[in-house]
A protein has these predicted regions:
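ATP-binding pocket architecture of kinase catalytic cores
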Residues: 20, 29-148, 152, 159
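Glycan-recognition and catalytic cores of secretory/periplasmic carbohydrate-active enzymes
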Residues: 129, 136, 140-143, 147, ...
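Protein kinase-like catalytic core scaffold
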Residues: 27, 39-40, 66, 80, ...
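An alpha-helical support segment within catalytic cores of ATP-dependent transferases
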Residues: 1, 5-8, 127-139, 144, ...
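ATP-binding glycine-rich phosphate-binding loop
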Residues: 11-29
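Active-site activation/catalytic loop segments of kinase-like enzymes and analogous catalytic loops
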Residues: 151-160, 222-258
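Short secondary-structure junctions
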Residues: 5-14, 63-65
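Active-site acidic catalytic loop and adjacent metal/ATP-binding pocket
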Residues: 25-32, 122, 177-223, 235-236
Length: 261
């Protein structure tokens, strides 16, 4: 990773900082030069995953979407340098509201509105001209992928609560949900897949920038909305969820017909 930076920059960095893990097998570093300019170095263990991110980042850059740019890639394809989108995540910015059990201040709600208002542009503009065959680990959200998520919920959450439930009825409900989610593929767009507050960085003006989209694929856009509004630990009140949903739908109308019935 250090060699890649030196080859690209022409000199050694002034400082190197390893960043906290992000729940994946990738390792992140922040490189700074003598002028204080920074880049993020990424070391991954999967070439296929790296290739997906590199392709998506370049595609989104062509679409002028608020994502990082990849500026250098190692010959092994296991390391790359990307632009640094800041130190503060949306998750960090919402800490006070979380600590108050979901009683978010006006400024925090405004950050949430700005973030979810950007989602339709990523989904629909991002899908234009995108070669989904280059996505990883799959090109589109199919029934198998839906059941993977549903079973993760069943075994890693529901069964750990000790609640009694009818597994047969649950499987039937899962089947109906999978059918609804897969739905009409012609209405699918880019599915971010992991659209949550930890993957949103805020620039100096408080504008959202988006990272960690390497698992994106073609899929139902509703998935990302649910991921954001019902993400663990944020404690959004029903009224706030309704408000953010309305913000998303208003933004989505620029790109697609919206049925709120």
């Amino acid at each position: 990773m250090l060699r890649l930076y030196e080859d690209w920059r022409g000199c050694a960095p002034q400082s190197v900082e390893q960043l906290p893990g992000a729940g994946s097998n990738r390792t992140y570093y922040r490189f700074r030069d003598a002028e204080g300019n920074s880049l993020i170095g990424v070391v991954g263990t999967s070439r296929e995953e790296n290739e997906a991110f590199i392709y998506l980042a370049r595609h989104f850059g062509q679409k002028r979407l608020p994502m990082p740019r990849v500026v250098a890639v190692s010959t092994s394809r296991l390391c790359y340098l990307q632009t640094d989108l800041g130190h503060r995540s949306l998750f960090d910015a919402l800490s006070e509201g979380r600590e108050k059990g979901g009683r978010y201040a006006h400024e925090e709600k405004e950050l949430l509105r700005r973030t979810i208002a950007e989602l339709p542009r990523i989904q629909f503009v991002g899908a234009e001209g995108l070669d989904f065959g280059r996505c990883y680990p799959m090109a589109s959200m199919d029934r198998t992928a839906v059941f993977f998520d549903l079973n993760y919920f069943k075994y890693c959450f529901l069964k750990t609560t000790g609640l009694d439930f009818n597994e047969v009825k649950l499987e039937k409900a899962f089947s109906e949900m999978a059918k609804d989610l897969v739905g009409d593929p012609d209405r699918h767009a880019f599915q971010y897949r992991d659209f949550q507050a930890r993957n949103v960085m805020l620039d100096r003006d408080g504008q959202p920038r988006f990272i960690d989209f390497q698992g994106g694929r073609r899929g139902p856009v509703e998935y990302d909305v649910a991921s954001f509004l019902w993400q663990a630990s944020v404690h959004y009140a029903p009224e706030l969820r309704h408000e953010l949903m309305a913000t998303y739908l208003d933004a989505a109308r620029l790109y697609t017909d919206v049925d709120t019935g």
